[in-house]
């Protein structure tokens, strides 16, 4: 399998999700005629936070996935982390954007994201550590 294939597919899917979240923000900005901030509109604020939160957590997760994949971790292990990241980000976005917001979905999405971030960090430390020890 070519290097970073799993990470590339995951990044492509996440890129499309980010595009959708961005279009959601733009739509609310146009609807409410707000160019900066949320203008006190709850729906715009939620859309902005869904997009912002995505932008905060996805890059480090993709970097950790790429590190794991470049260090010859099994493709299925890298893919499992990618799936967990995608599921977590979708749940969070749905939970925060639903009117009224679905707090349980939002929290579940963050749990997926945090667990995945910790798992990716631990996997990188363990996998690379074992490879270095021979």
Where are these regions (language model features)?
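Core segments of transmembrane alpha-helices
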Residues: 53-65, 117-118
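Physicochemical signature of membrane-embedded alpha-helices that form the seven-helix bundle of GPCRs
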Residues: 10, 48-51, 81-84, 109-116
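Juxtamembrane boundary at the C-terminal end of a transmembrane helix
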Residues: 122-134
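Membrane-embedded alpha-helical transmembrane segments of multi-pass integral membrane proteins
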Residues: 14-17, 21, 84-92, 116-123
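Short alpha-helical packing/oligomerization segments
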Residues: 66-87
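Cytosolic, membrane-interface loops and tails of multi-pass inner-membrane proteins
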Residues: 23-48
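Interfacial loop-to-transmembrane junctions
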Residues: 91-118
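N-terminal signal-anchor transmembrane alpha helix
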Residues: 2-32
